[in-house]
Each structure stands twice: as C-alpha cells, then as structure tokens.
Amino acid sequence: MPNSTAQYPEKDSWEFLVKSGIAGGTAGCVAKSVVAPLDRVKILYQTNHASYRGYAYSRHGLYKAIKHIYHVYGLHGLYQGHTATLYRVFPYAGIKFVAYEQVRRVLIRDPEHETHARRFLSGSLAGTCSVFFTYPLELIRVRLAYITNTGKNPTLTQVTKDIFHERDFLCNKKYPGLSRLSKICNFYRGFSVTLTGIFPYAGMSFLAYDLATDFFHKQKIDEWVSTKKSDKKLKTWPELLCGAFAGVCGQTVSYPFEVCRRKMQIGGIRKNKSFLRLKQVVQTTYKEAGMRGFFVGLTIGYIKVIPMVSTSFFVYNHSKALLGID
C-alpha cells in the first residue's frame, strides 16, 4: 500500500464520505455478529426478564442462560433479532465513523487543537448523530431479542406493527391532530436516556482508543508494535488491545444509562403498552435490586464489548486501507 498521503482522497470529498461509510458499516456488522449471542442474553438480563431473572446474579449464569436458549430455541434463538441488528448497525456504524471523521476534521484542524476535550467531543457528537437516525431500528431489535414465549419466532414486520399500534405518550383525546405523529414517537421510547448515555459512551470510546494508540506510538514502544510497512500502522495485537481498552472505558461510564434505556424500550410490552418515564425506571430498578440493579449484566457487557469494539476498530481501519482511504 502506498505510504504517500497525497494519493488518498481528501476527507471532505464525496469519495471519502462514501468509502468511510462503507468501511464503518462493514466494521459494525462484523463486530455485532461476533457477539450476538452475548448481546441477546445481556438484553434479557437488563430488562429483568422473568424467565432469566435467576441467572442474572448467579456465578455461572451466563453459561446457563446461553445453554437454556440453545436447548429451547436452538442456534436461531441465540441470534433472534440479529437481522434487525444488522439493519440498524450498518447505517449506525457507517454514520458514526463518517461523522467522527468529519467532526474531528473540523474540531482538530492541526496538532495544537488535538486536546482530550476535542477528541471526546468528536466521538460524542458522532455517536449522537448516528443514534438519532437509527434509533427506531434499535428499538425493534431490542423487542425481537426480548420476546421469548410466543410459541413462534417474532417477525420484524409484526414487531414493527405492534410498536406502531401501542398506546402513545400523547393523549389522543387531547391532541387528536397529533395522533399519527405520536405513533411515530412510539419508535423513540427511551430515546432521551439513550442520548444521555451515548454522549459519554461514544466520546470515551474514541478518546480511549486515541490515547491507547498514542501510547503504543511512543518512541520506545513503537519499534516493536508497528508494522514494517508503515510507522503509522500498529500490528494486529496492539490494535485489538486499543479497541478493547476503548470498549471497556466506554461501557463503564455509560452502563447505568443503558440499563434504564432497555427497560424503557420494552415498556410497551410490560406496562399496559404505556410509556415508561426515566424516573419510574430508576425508582423501580433501585427498589427491586438496589444499586447493583443498574449494573446487572455488566460482566457480560465487558465480555461482549472487548471483542466487539476491538473487531470494530480493527475492521474499520483495514477496510479503509482496502478502499484506499486514510
């Protein structure tokens, strides 16, 4: 691969936007596919599903939960809702990486502006942008993963219809003209808390990845972690380690928000198809399990996030190289 940056397209060109979007979308899909079974179990834990409540705090609960799902529903059960995940992840990851590259280009125009705050803000704004455009698909994915006892596998079409016809957060009697709009808002259950959580998660993930990369590029370390082809490119293992560090940092700071978000997303199933407010979710969670209720499934989160984020950054960087962008 040529080392001259002059041969790469400019970051504000359409070619770079399209190719970075493809690279980001591909990275997201590969990463999510790697950890799909863990994601299914984590959602069941976070939403306090009655059939899996006993596994959540047990020593070997993760293994037992996966074994139970496989025994009852087969391999497909571990990937239930994964199609909806891929529909969401490709545009989500694509938009996130494109937005990050563009926001970073604006906020960090030269090395003097490359501060921790600007790096964090670049990641946070990128995550916010991607969530806004893809949240309805995320809600559908969570519903598909949560449903377990219908006797047949729920379909994407059926779940979408169910969400649309659920009781909306506006009273139709008071606001009859907003009925259709409020139905669309059904697909944004938990959106406010999602934004609250994605801001620190995305910001910390990108910041931690940059800091880890900077660490490996220090002179005494760079000699044995960089490839021979390019001083800028890390070997596989340090590159994966940077992604793992980024994932752990992002997951830690945002996990309580994620637990609340999941419970708000499935509120239409559990609470007479009504909207759950953040205050209700926080009070109920604390009453049922105390502070540890906000961190239920965090172990799975760590187990999941290390391979997922590592794979995501790794595939993104190598996809960019294959597509001829930097």
UniProtKB/Swiss-Prot annotation:
Pfam families: Mito_carr. Solcar repeats lie at residues 15-106, 114-215, 234-322. Keywords: Membrane, Mitochondrion, Mitochondrion inner membrane, Repeat, Transmembrane, Transmembrane helix, Transport. It is found in: Mitochondrion inner membrane. GO terms for cellular component: mitochondrial inner membrane. SUPFAM superfamilies: Mitochondrial carrier (SSF103506). InterPro entries: GDC-like, Mit_carrier, Mitochondrial_sb/sol_carrier, Mt_carrier_dom_sf. The chain crosses the membrane at residues 16-36, 83-103, 120-140, 191-211, 240-260, 294-314. One of its GO terms (molecular function) is coenzyme A transmembrane transporter activity. It comes from the Eukaryota. GO terms for biological process: mitochondrial coenzyme A transmembrane transport. Signal peptide: none annotated. It is a multi-pass membrane protein. The keyword Phosphoprotein does not apply. This is Uncharacterized mitochondrial carrier C17H9.08. It comes from Schizosaccharomyces pombe (strain 972 / ATCC 24843). The lineage of its organism: Eukaryota, Fungi, Dikarya, Ascomycota, Taphrinomycotina.
